[in-house]
From Swiss-Prot:
Gene it is expressed from: thiM
Protein's recorded name: Hydroxyethylthiazole kinase
Residues that, per the record, bind substrate: 52, 200
Gene3D superfamilies xref list: 3.40.1190.20
Pathway(s) annotated for this protein in UniProt: Cofactor biosynthesis; thiamine diphosphate biosynthesis; 4-methyl-5-(2-phosphoethyl)-thiazole from 5-(2-hydroxyethyl)-4-methylthiazole: step 1/1
Record carries keyword Iron-sulfur: no
Function noted in UniProt: Catalyzes the phosphorylation of the hydroxyl group of 4-methyl-5-beta-hydroxyethylthiazole (THZ).
Length: 264
């Protein structure tokens, strides 16, 4: 295992983005109430198809036919947990890749226990901030809701261990994003602090990661490409935005117009 995270090339991101736009994956998002519309728009901008099917019986049916599933526990409650269990079980049986976004895990008991329960169904990837990843790995962390008081690099050892234990890819997002399968580590720079001042960029990234997990080929590379594309779009949107209000439309526009030749 590399002790120093490798960099990720624009050419690698370009290859994955081309594959993603061509595949146009159907992504089933069981996500939180605050970010549903924004998440759907981000997926649409990248030529994916979002769906939010929340009834437990229907969620199970839909996850079996979707290309990927996102589980985001931001606004978790008991009925939604039932739907998530059903969807994850169905996805697992169908071989559908699913991604866990463990929002505020470590700070609240029900969601922490629930997310640890879901790990038995082997997610294709886990995407969270440093505090969430450290808490999910069973380490002490400092977080407040969706905000993290821990540095993403400090959480990398926990991410590696979690990836090895579960057999998954773990993404720790922050000023620098780190992606690991427990053996290989990749660093993704870029993005902008503006992305932390609007609701939903991290949650939307998790949905994009789910879509990229459905692609054929090296999953670690595809997941890293998802982070690269979102960070680049955020950085470019910030450069032409006046503030958070104008950032969101510029961000969606950049995702919509971003092509492989812009990356390579």
């Amino acid at each position: 295992m590399n002790t120093q995270p490798a960099d990720f090339s624009a050419a690698q991101a370009a290859t994955s983005l081309t594959q993603f736009r061509s595949a146009a994956p159907l992504v089933h998002c069981l996500t939180n109430d605050v970010v549903q519309s924004f998440t759907a728009n981000v997926l649409l901008a990248l030529n994916a198809s979002p769906a939010m099917v929340v009834d437990p019986e229907e969620a199970a049916q839909f996850s079996a036919v979707a290309d990927a599933l996102l589980i985001n526990v931001g606004t978790l409650e008991r009925t939604r947990a039932e739907a998530m269990r059903a969807a994850v079980n169905s996805a697992h049986q169908a071989g559908t890749p699913w991604v866990l976004d463990p929002v505020a895990v470590g700070g609240l008991t029900f969601r922490t226990e629930f997310c640890r329960e879901l790990l038995t169904w082997k997610p294709a990837a886990i995407r969270g901030n440093a505090s969430e990843i450290m808490a999910l790995a069973g380490l002490a962390a400092q977080g407040r809701g969706v905000d993290s008081a821990d540095d993403s690099l400090a959480a990398l050892p926990a991410a590696r261990e979690l990836a090895r234990q579960v057999g998954t890819i773990v993404v720790v997002t922050g000023a620098v994003d780190y992606v690991t399968d427990g053996e290989r580590d990749i660093a993704v720079t870029g993005g902008d602090s503006m992305m932390t001042r609007v609701v939903g960029t991290g949650c939307a990234l998790s949905a994009v990661v789910a879509g990229f997990c459905s692609l054929e080929g090296d999953r670690l590379s595809h997941v890293t490409a998802a982070c690269y594309v979102m960070a680049l779009a955020g950085q470019q949107a910030t450069s032409v935005s006046q503030g958070t209000g104008s950032f969101i439309p510029h961000f969606l526009d950049r995702l919509y117009t971003l092509r492989a030749e812009d990356l390579a």
